[in-house]
Swiss-Prot record:
It comes from Psychrobacter arcticus (strain DSM 17307 / VKM B-2377 / 273-4). The gene is ispG. Belongs to the IspG family. It catalyses: (2E)-4-hydroxy-3-methylbut-2-enyl diphosphate + oxidized [flavodoxin] + H2O + 2 H(+) = 2-C-methyl-D-erythritol 2,4-cyclic diphosphate + reduced [flavodoxin]. Pathway: Isoprenoid biosynthesis; isopentenyl diphosphate biosynthesis via DXP pathway; isopentenyl diphosphate from 1-deoxy-D-xylulose 5-phosphate: step 5/6. This is 4-hydroxy-3-methylbut-2-en-1-yl diphosphate synthase (flavodoxin). Gene3D superfamilies: Dihydropteroate synthase-like, Sulfite Reductase Hemoprotein, domain 1. SUPFAM superfamilies: Dihydropteroate synthetase-like, Nitrite and sulphite reductase 4Fe-4S domain-like. One of its GO terms (biological process) is isopentenyl diphosphate biosynthetic process, methylerythritol 4-phosphate pathway.
Length: 371
């Protein structure tokens, strides 16, 4: 059960990265980027698999050398998730990694080289039927744009993006998505609002170099949350100085909080006070860890006393109202039964897993009926 204000999402052109649709009516996808040595195939594959387990729809892999291109080809064979190759400066790497199986190329047409080299890359992308992401960052704008605007701002980032877009459009290539990232929340939001008014291709949202886990998550939630509420954005990446699977989790937490896309358990819990009938923080910390693998969407409310407990529990799929020695369980808004307060973690985990199985079976039956 949930309530939400409608979000009027901006209608964009739909493109495909592998089998994942980006833009149009497709769900907003969540992606991350590996931080291993790409040449360490085993470590990179293991990291990608951890991200996929966390829910990643797409993964980006850096390919700065021809050795990494060779490794990319091996990685491509070992994972099922679509892979985006991150390429800078050397157009030959872009050509080689496309041939090695890249599902998308992340480039800046402005730093790949001459028009002839850009034409080669675009022809290659057309040949392999893969899209290109134009990635503009506030920290690496072209020198003439820096001189013109003196400092990074939304207009400067828009001009850089439109310059790169014009290169692709002149080559009759429209299978692209765009990002205009900055490490500053306000600059990021301004740039995306400006570009969204100019183009109808998909937008990849992110705050670049957002920082360490806590502060980076906050910056990303503010910037991306505000843009998503405005209906802007088709795929997101949370850039953190942390393990990439944590980026995936935060990305889905943002989408869940906006009722845009649910993936796993949405935890609702009180901050706890002297009224609590059990250790709320201990219970919730344990549950968050134990239930990380759940993918079926549901709301779980755990409140430590009867002041706000019943109201929150009625709005959740599973709700707990704390009391001693027994706590009251609500199921789908209705009172259900009592459970031992001393054994809350095990009891709640069991109920959540059972509900997840019910939801999975229901979803499978709906798929069968459609077929």
């Amino acid at each position: 059960m949930s309530t939400s204000a409608p979000i009027n999402r901006r209608l964009t052109k739909k493109i495909y990265v592998g089998d994942v649709a980006i833009g149009g009516d497709a769900p907003i996808s969540v992606q991350s980027m590996t931080n291993t040595d790409t040449c360490d195939v085993a470590a990179t594959v293991a990291q990608i698999e951890r991200c996929v387990e966390a829910g990643a729809d797409l993964m980006r892999v850096s390919t700065p050398t021809m050795d990494t291109v060779k490794a990319f080809g091996e990685i491509r064979k070992l994972v099922s998730v679509p892979l985006i190759a991150d390429v800078h400066f050397d157009h030959k790497i872009a050509l080689a990694v496309a041939a090695a199986g890249a599902d998308c190329l992340r480039i800046n047409p402005g730093n790949i080289g001459s028009d002839a080299k850009v034409r080669e890359v675009v022809a290659c992308a057309k040949h392999y039927n893969i899209p290109i992401r134009i990635g503009v960052n506030a920290g690496s704008l072209e020198k003439d744009i820096q001189r013109k605007y003196k400092e990074p701002n939304g207009a400067a980032m828009l001009e850089s993006a439109m310059r790169h877009i014009d290169i692709l459009e002149r080559l009759n290539f429209d299978q692209y998505k765009v990002s205009v990232k900055a490490s500053n929340v306000f600059l990021t939001m301004d740039a995306y609002r400006l570009i969204s008014a100019q183009i109808d291709n998909p937008l990849h949202l992110g705050v670049t170099e957002a920082g360490v886990y806590r502060t980076g998550s906050v910056k990303s939630a503010i910037a991306l949350g505000g843009l998503l509420l405005d209906g802007i954005g088709d795929t997101i990446r949370i850039s953190l100085a942390a393990e990439p699977e944590e980026e995936i989790k935060i990305g889905f937490d943002i989408l869940k909080s906006l009722n845009i896309r649910s993936n796993g358990v949405n935890f609702i819990a009180c901050p706890s006070c002297s009224r609590q009938e059990f250790d709320v923080i201990r219970v919730m910390t344990a549950l968050e860890s134990r239930l990380e693998d759940i993918r079926e969407p549901m709301n779980l409310s755990v409140i430590g006393c009867k002041v706000n407990g019943p109201g929150e529990a009625k709005e959740a799929d599973i709700g707990i109202v704390g009391a001693a020695p027994k706590s009251l369980v609500y199921r789908m808004g209705e009172k259900s039964h009592l459970i031992d307060t001393d054994n809350l973690v095990d009891e709640i985990e069991g109920m959540v897993r059972a509900h997840a199985e019910e939801l999975a079976k229901k979803r499978e039956n709906e798929i069968i009926r459609v077929r």
